[in-house]
Amino acid sequence: MPKQADYTWGAKKNLDTIACLPEDVKQFKDLLYAMYGFTATEEEPTSEVHPGAILKGTVVDISKDFVVVDVGLKSEGVIPMSEFIDSSEGLTVGAEVEVYLDQTEDDEGKVVLSREKATRQRQWEYILAHCEEGSIVKGQITRKVKGGLIVDIGMEAFLPGSQIDNKKIKNLDDYVGKVCEFKILKINVDRRNVVVSRRELLEAERISKKAELIEQITIGERRKGIVKNITDFGVFLDLDGIDGLLHITDMTWKRIRHPSEMVELNQELEVIILSVDKEKGRVALGLKQKEHNPWEDIEKKYPPGKRVRGKIVKLLPYGAFIEIEEGIEGLIHVSEMSWVKNIVDPNEVVNKGDEVEVVVLSIQKDEGKISLGLKQTKHNPWDNIEEKYPIGLRVTAEIKNLTNYGAFVELEPGIEGLIHISDMSWIKKVSHPSELFKKGNTVEAVILSVDKESKKITLGVKQLTPNPWDEIEVMFPVGSDISGVVTKITAFGAFVELQNGIEGLIHVSELSEKPFAKIEDVLSIGDKVSAKVIKLDPDHKKVSLSIKEFLVHGGDAGHDAEEESSDRD
């Protein structure tokens, strides 16, 4: 425990009372007198006195401005009256006083004495004898200096700016003249200075008071506090020496964006103690708990399926929050805004401030959540979609979008269907829908399937006409002769377009009996050729043709093709 110094600030100690000090201090005094040329018993100066010694002298004269003191040297010393200011009223001729020997003689041969330096010396000796680092002393703040304040604790001590207070300081001048207790932080013997702190005592007092208050606080009680800080997540209140946090979620039952919407600095609030952590010294406060909780009977008041009206108070990418009564908000998710449109942004349907009617979908009381639906207030066109668009129905629709895998068409506002790329042509291999369709055009198609649950409709264009491959064996029986136009030449053969757009392949081995280096030596794209059907594969939509077979069986056209080829050679 730091010792409490029995010291009165600002008083210039009567050095003559040194004999009343405790025994150990007397011994210390005797040592000092020996150092300064005094005898330990008589306390009289020795024959050899040096500057810096403290001497005992007698007042021989007093004037308005000066005091003349005889210390037993060859001349008397003249000391300014200002150095006796604290004891001038009791100062009389013949009184004994302690003085500091500045010089044994000046330029005029006179002794130079100082009462003030003697007083400071005795004060320093007293500090060394009675105080240590950690001691508590009382003092008065006398003036402002660079970096802090000066405190009179019987001698001047330095109070750094960081040690003045435990709160933010606006003006150092406000502290000048105050009488306070201070803790000695450092005593520098070599430099004869003392550093003190007021902040450490205030902080210790605060911690002690906080611990005491923590023990007194009970959960559920009401207390008044002053708003000392406002943050994004809540408000800190001073509860008469202890800080408590009023979280933004405990300020009101309704939604607020920032605590400053409800409170301001230095405002007094009555709050309820929600929780106390004595180990960490934390107190959680509540303001909304003083009012009725509108969520208590929420399930009875707003059962699922009930229609309610409310105001849009907030829009987020995933939905809109609607206030259905003060303190009660629900969410309309984007998926619950339209039966037929894929809503990406709530602004497509509603705006902040709109009054809307919604349907309660579900309630999560413990989490304070209500799910609402906007589309549920309107008829769902998918309810009777199967009756409206039966399979096999022919429809005309506008092409809304083309993708790599198909074309989307709008059957009615909000109801779209897909024509898959595989349902566009019986015979043509379509690489992209843009080969057949253009966005914005209308197209006739057949309903192929309706999935009510997944909200999907598929359509087909090729289904408008019979599948020619179903009649392929009748149209092109094996062994029959056909004619067509060469549309494509590959390394393995030539493709020929036949009747109804069906393609047949003349393999390279079936082109000619005569040897040739490459197919282009025999055929070119655009050539009209005759060939014989040698094989059909309806499942894989393949027709195999042969010019060789056609020629072997005496087909004139086949000969003409070879002759044309010979002419090119």
UniProtKB/Swiss-Prot annotation:
SUPFAM superfamilies the UniProt entry points to: Nucleic acid-binding proteins (SSF50249)
GO CC annotations, alphabetized: cytosolic small ribosomal subunit
GO molecular function: mRNA binding; structural constituent of ribosome
GO biological process: translation
Keywords for the protein's UniProt record, in alphabetical order: Repeat, Ribonucleoprotein, Ribosomal protein, RNA-binding
Domain (S1 motif) ranges: 52-116, 134-199, 220-288, 305-375, 392-462, 479-548
NCBIfam families attached to this UniProt entry: PRK06299.1-3, rpsA
Protein role: Binds mRNA; thus facilitating recognition of the initiation point. It is needed to translate mRNA with a short Shine-Dalgarno (SD) purine-rich sequence.
PANTHER family: 30S RIBOSOMAL PROTEIN S1, SMALL RIBOSOMAL SUBUNIT PROTEIN BS1C
Family: Belongs to the bacterial ribosomal protein bS1 family.
Protein name: Small ribosomal subunit protein bS1
Species per Swiss-Prot/TrEMBL record: Chlamydia trachomatis serovar D (strain ATCC VR-885 / DSM 19411 / UW-3/Cx)
